[in-house]
From Swiss-Prot:
Name recorded for this polypeptide: Probable formamidopyrimidine-DNA glycosylase
Name of a matching Pfam family: Fapy_DNA_glyco
Top-level taxonomic group: Viruses
EC number: 3.2.2.23, 4.2.99.18
Family: Belongs to the FPG family.
Length: 287
């Protein structure tokens, strides 16, 4: 599942190619929206063409900002979430669901094998701000998050980190597993039971892992933008963090052993019934 770093890098690439370009049409050619169009779609189409002014993200939420060059007060927003398998490309990939047509024959495509990704169209800046305010601070983009709030909650730390509203946003299954392993924290441990030192260490590894995943990431969640990813500069998030690895890699996520040979357990901790989510951890390391 694409997480904060992939979504942020995707937005960087989309902005590089499409900022200042004019969107002429968007068509849903397959998937969940081919029969039932997203909220606001008809009104949005009626206002095209529109020029892209910005592509941005918060956590795992991406949005386009567009305006009418003849009436700059006429602003529109495309909301997008990636779900489990959503990704953007500059070519028509397998499982393409949405096609965005720009001037000068430029195209952007959204593919989604499992169809959990979402779109919404809105001309309300207030509605967008309300959506953004519902999300916690972006773990990749913010240096001053008060994660000591973790101690307020008698919930497993793995659940608190994956909750997009309580502490921060942008972390999912793979990042939380890797962060807790690096921080040597048992994912079952309640937030209220973490020591100040554990929280300080946790915050360091959140910054470290999100930065590393953004800077150099080839784990497969944005393969359709692999070529473009290698050509674009990275923003200097968490400037005081200096990863020693050249590339992000999984140490415990979907592994049977960690790099030192310690057993990795796949544990269902979050959710209930069939919807429980699996996390990976090494009991010999994480206490």
């Amino acid at each position: 599942m694409p997480e904060g770093p992939e979504v942020a890098l995707t937005a960087d690439i989309l902005e590089k190619y499409f900022k200042g370009k004019t969107l002429e049409y968007i068509d849903f050619i397959s998937g969940r929206y081919s029969k039932s169009e997203p909220e606001g779609y008809d009104d949005f189409i009626a206002n095209l063409p529109l020029k892209v002014s910005n592509v941005d993200t918060k956590g795992k939420f991406l949005w386009f900002e567009l305006f009418d060059p003849n009436d700059k007060s006429n602003k529109w927003y495309i909301w997008n979430t990636f779900g489990l398998t959503g990704m953007w490309s500059l070519f028509e990939a397998k499982y393409t669901r949405a096609v965005l047509s720009f001037d000068n024959e430029l195209m952007a495509y959204f593919s989604d094998m499992r169809n959990f990704g979402t779109f919404k169209f809105s001309n309300s800046e207030k509605e967008l701000k309300r959506k953004l305010n519902e999300l916690g601070p972006d773990f990749l983009k913010n240096d001053d998050i008060d994660i000591s709030k973790i101690k307020k909650y008698k919930q497993p730390i793995v659940a608190l980190l994956m909750d997009q509203k309580k502490i921060g946003s942008g972390l999912g299954n793979y990042l939380v597993a890797e962060i807790l392993y690096r921080a040597k924290i048992d994912p079952h441990k309640l937030g209220s039971n973490l020591t100040d030192q554990e929280i300080e260490n946790l915050w360091y590894w959140i910054k470290y892992e999100t930065k590393l995943a953004y800077d150099s990431n080839h784990i497969g969640y944005m393969v359709n933008l692999e070529n473009e990813s290698s050509k674009i500069g990275r923003k200097n998030y968490h400037p005081n963090i200096h990863p020693t690895e050249k590339e992000f890699d999984f140490l415990v996520y979907r592994k049977k052993k960690d790099p030192n040979g310690n057993k990795v357990i796949a544990d269902k901790i979050i959710g209930s019934g069939k919807n429980k989510r699996t996390t990976y951890w090494a009991p010999a390391i994480q206490k």
